[in-house]
Swiss-Prot record:
GO terms for molecular function: rRNA binding; structural constituent of ribosome. NCBIfam families: L3_bact (TIGR03625). One of the primary rRNA binding proteins, it binds directly near the 3'-end of the 23S rRNA, where it nucleates assembly of the 50S subunit. Disulfide bonds: none annotated. GO terms for cellular component: cytosolic large ribosomal subunit. InterPro entries: Ribosomal_uL3 (IPR000597), Ribosomal_uL3_bac/org-type (IPR019927), Ribosomal_uL3_CS (IPR019926), Transl_B-barrel_sf (IPR009000). Belongs to the universal ribosomal protein uL3 family. This is Large ribosomal subunit protein uL3. It comes from the Bacteria.
Length: 209
């Protein structure tokens, strides 16, 4: 069954394995999540649990939000996300979900929003090769051919300049190196999408070997 938790990206560091290998890790701070709602097939057409993460001030919450979290007897949450494919019997409304659900060595999928890069050209955005930089060349960093003349239009999907980054990215099959229950930290091998302090979702891997 799937299990997951919401957290924040703190940054990257390094740890040593028992055999002396140096492992780059990303530190995820996952304070206890609260189960706000259980979606059922009878009422909602599908099964899922709704997790809330990171308290926010009541002043910034509207009445529907306050009423929703009151059922779980908790404070309004800044981030609310659903998790499907879980064991519904293992969760109750108001229950806290902590980092202890994971253990070192588990394989997980990590989802976040990539860093925004603004408006970028075809070389940076799509990895295209540039043209000759020598004297006389009139083609340096432009997108190149727009396609055949006959259609009288540019086909959809042509790699062109535009906004880069700020997309939801999922990196699959990352290993949990360490779980620090006292400080609510997950140390995940390698890098994960997004800038520091961005919202991160850690879930059981769907393609783990």
């Amino acid at each position: 069954m799937t299990k997951g938790i919401l957290g924040r990206k703190i940054g990257m560091t390094q740890v040593f394995a028992e055999n002396g290998d140096l492992i780059p890790v990303t530190v995820i701070e996952a304070a206890p999540n609260v189960v706000l709602q259980k979606k059922t097939a009878e009422n909602d057409g599908y099964e899922a649990i709704q997790l809330g993460f990171d308290d926010k001030r009541e002043k910034l919450s509207n009445k529907p939000e306050k009423g929703h979290v009151a059922k779980a007897e908790t404070a309004p949450k800044r981030f609310v996300k659903e998790l499907r494919g879980v064991d519904m019997d293992a969760y109750e409304i108001g229950q806290e979900v902590k980092v202890e659900i994971f253990s070192a060595g588990e394989i997980v999928d990590v989802t976040g929003v990539s860093k925004g890069k603004g408006f970028q050209g075809a070389i940076k955005r799509h990895g295209q090769s540039r043209g000759p930089m020598s004297h006389g060349s009139r083609y340096h960093r432009r997108p190149g051919s727009m396609g055949p003349v006959d259609p009288n239009r540019v086909f959809k999907g042509k790699l062109l300049p535009g906004r880069m980054g700020g997309d939801q990215i999922t990196v699959q099959n990352l290993e949990i190196v360490k779980v620090d229950a006292e400080r609510n930290l997950l140390l995940i091998k390698g890098n994960v999408p997004g800038a520091r302090k961005t919202l991160i979702t850690v879930k059981s891997a769907v393609k783990s070997k």
